[in-house]
């Protein structure tokens, strides 16, 4: 996600309250107020859809944009079933103001669903255009990378704050009692937030 982008990828239009995405191959650019999102996904081999799923939604005013990037345990039909479940869960919870509540609700409902023990690592982000802040929650997912245009440097996007004791930030769907933290970063013009699954690191 960045404030500026040049790409030959096809553009998508996001309707208000729509949850866009899935686990199919795509190379799309979506412009939202204050931020541009590029989503690129390719399944392994000849598979039509993989275990990596992506979703993007926006409030009616466009001030708030949310994304969920997940790596589902399993492939093929099992991953597709879980992807559909995650999409429905995100649609039901997209209006929650606090991101931690959204993540915890999705986790509880996924853990309670009959998914045969399947789970997913996930990264959830909420972009507020009025403050230029991105709030992130990480559920056992690879750490995103942050590029600062002003200094032309990359760094891991992590927080060192401690939260409450107990099970924290585990993959979604393992245990309904897990709590999730969140932290915010301010993005400036030209900054880039790179979010990915372990498929990227494994292919390098």
Predicted feature descriptions by range:
Residues 75-83:
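Conserved long alpha-helical elements within nucleotide-processing catalytic cores of c-di-GMP signaling
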Residues 1-68, 73, 90-204:
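Conserved subregion of the PPM/PP2C metallophosphatase catalytic domain
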């Amino acid at each position: 996600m960045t404030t500026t982008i040049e790409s030959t990828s096809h553009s998508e239009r996001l309707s208000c309250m729509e949850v866009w995405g899935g686990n199919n191959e795509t190379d799309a650019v979506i412009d939202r107020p204050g931020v541009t999102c590029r989503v690129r996904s390719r399944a392994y081999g000849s598979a039509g859809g993989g275990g990596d799923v992506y979703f993007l939604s926006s409030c009616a005013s466009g001030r708030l944009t949310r994304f969920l990037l997940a790596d589902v345990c399993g492939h093929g039909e099992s991953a597709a079933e879980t992807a559909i479940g995650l999409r429905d869960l995100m649609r039901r919870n997209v209006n929650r103001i606090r991101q931690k509540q959204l993540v915890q609700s999705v986790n509880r409902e996924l853990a309670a669903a009959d998914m045969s023990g399947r789970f997913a690592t996930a990264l959830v982000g909420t972009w507020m255009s009025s403050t230029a802040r991105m709030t992130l929650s990480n559920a056992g997912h690879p750490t995103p990378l942050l590029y600062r245009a002003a200094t032309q440097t990359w760094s891991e996007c992590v927080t060192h704050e401690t939260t409450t004791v107990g099970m924290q930030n585990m993959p979604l769907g393992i245990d309904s009692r897990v709590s999730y933290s969140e932290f915010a970063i301010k993005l400036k013009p030209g900054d880039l937030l790179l979010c990915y699954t372990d498929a990227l690191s494994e292919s390098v």
